[in-house]
């Protein structure tokens, strides 16, 4: 049985520790943990094309582009999400390897199940 099934809620540090050991990705919202579903080929292609276009546009700037394997902390909502694509230009995010917390832009690709 997983820790998520045994434990009703997590605090953020416990979630980050637990999530780092999981084979699948989970998002976190105010103590609750949610397993992430896979994406279609079209969804992944659209997200990748957007990430590549942003990366090319931002080349030479202090900004970095991340895809769906990097967590984004939304402190105001006590949450960690895996956006399809996001951009951060914050120097503080360069030092943080497990997640980023200062997104300048967030891109979510909508699908029939998420729109």
Predicted segments, located by residue:
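Gly/Pro/Ser/Thr-rich low-complexity, intrinsically disordered segments predominantly at protein N-termini
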Residues: 1-115
């Amino acid at each position: 049985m997983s820790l998520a099934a045994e434990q009703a809620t997590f605090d953020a540090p416990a979630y980050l520790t637990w999530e780092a050991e999981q084979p699948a990705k989970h998002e976190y919202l105010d103590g609750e943990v949610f397993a992430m579903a896979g994406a279609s080929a079209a969804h992944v292609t659209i997200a990748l094309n957007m990430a590549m276009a942003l990366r090319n546009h931002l080349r030479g700037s202090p900004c970095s582009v991340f895809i769906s394997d990097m967590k984004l902390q939304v402190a105001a909502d006590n949450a960690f999400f895996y956006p399809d694509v996001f951009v951060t230009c914050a120097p503080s995010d360069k030092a943080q390897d497990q997640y980023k917390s200062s997104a300048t832009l967030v891109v979510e690709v909508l699908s029939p199940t998420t729109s």
